């Protein structure tokens, strides 16, 4: 999941494509920033160093941005056991990101907006943060 924008991405699309490793480029299906960001993050070591890969990819895409807002994003991804999420904006206006543990469902949800009436149970992820959710354990690190 990715929500956000890269200022001037239409002008930086080719440069972003060039950052995707050859072995991963065959998986590129569209021309959107989310897909390029994810493939570059995979090339930056997302499978073995999620926080490092996201931090490196954010820095790379922030440098590609040519217009204001330079870079705004939230993302969430999983290896099937651990859920990861990130929230970041170069201008302090990051898209919203919330998480919540459900005792009933025995799982965690990460969403851009709370989807039920029990808003008090949702916790907002701070801007410039990387999250690791493993069952009920929550670790939030500043990016």
Question: Residue spans of the language-model regions?
Answer:
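Conserved short alpha-helical segments that host acidic/polar catalytic motifs at enzyme active sites
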Residues: 2-143
């Amino acid at each position: 999941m990715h929500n956000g924008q890269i200022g001037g991405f239409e002008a930086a699309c080719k440069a972003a494509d060039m950052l995707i490793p050859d072995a991963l480029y065959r998986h590129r299906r569209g021309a959107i920033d989310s897909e390029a960001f994810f493939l570059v993050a995979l090339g930056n070591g997302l499978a073995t160093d999620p926080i490092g890969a996201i931090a490196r990819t954010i820095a790379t895409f922030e440098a590609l941005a040519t217009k204001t807002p330079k870079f705004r994003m939230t993302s969430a991804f999983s290896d099937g056991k651990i859920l990861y999420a990130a929230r970041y904006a170069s201008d302090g206006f990051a898209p919203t990101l919330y998480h919540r543990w459900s005792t009933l469902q025995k799982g965690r949800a990460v969403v851009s907006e709370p989807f039920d009436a029990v808003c008090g149970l949702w916790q907002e992820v701070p801007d410039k943060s990387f999250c690791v959710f493993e069952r009920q354990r929550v670790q939030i690190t500043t990016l």
